Amino acid sequence: MSAEHQDPRGERLQKVLAHAGVASRRRCEEIIAAGRVRVNGRVVTTLGTRVDPEHDRIEVDGRPIESTPPLYYALYKPTGVISTVHDPHGRTTARSLVSTEERIYPVGRLDRDSEGLLLFTNDGPLAQRLMHPRHEHEKQYYALIEGIPTNQALQALRRGLVLPSETRPLKAETQRLPAAWHWRGHRAPQGCRWLSIILREGHKHQIRRLLQATGHQVQRLIRVRMGTLMLGDLEPGQGRWLSPSERDALRASAGLGTREAER
């Protein structure tokens, strides 16, 4: 399959094979390189070839891979839990809190000390759209910080700050919430304040680093929205399957069509 015939919006072939249960991602790369994979009748040996598992016929050793139905699961990741599928150090992973054995993966990450909405799916095109900075999908957070930011500090966050190791300004659409505002009954202690923050790109520890640059330490950080998907009334450690309307709205916001999901 030549590069000009690839769909740039598709998924990498080795990832599709791994999600279909053929083998591990590394082993799938070896299978591709050995010439054992055909896409629409053509042998593919180039790693990174992009395919559409919904429309392309993919075969390994002459056998078509089984198409896995798309799955979408929302989890309230608690603090102290890492946003990975496996951890070599034996720490609790977000994946271990998901009540299914299906192969679904987290979309992006939340810091270990952060909490809130984490989406799991096997919908590769959706995950790619939600994570890639150029698509500018909104993610909303509530942050409890030490101190009360000035209007000048809030304006600086909205305009963007150049942080160490960054080459361009990072922005955060930040609003100071009323002193009486609370997150599920938890009001800001004296000398602290809750903020509402919206990001349209994601860099490591972006919110914590930006607020630290304005002189404020983050005590608590909660993600409550990813695009059109809301955390809702989930409690820490709880999860749920997305409704068809939630799934379709999320895909539509990412510029994708609807898909028939298993749940």
Model-assigned labels for residue ranges:
Residues 2-263:
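Basic, flexible Lys/Arg- and Gly-enriched helix-loop patches that mediate nucleic-acid binding at interfaces
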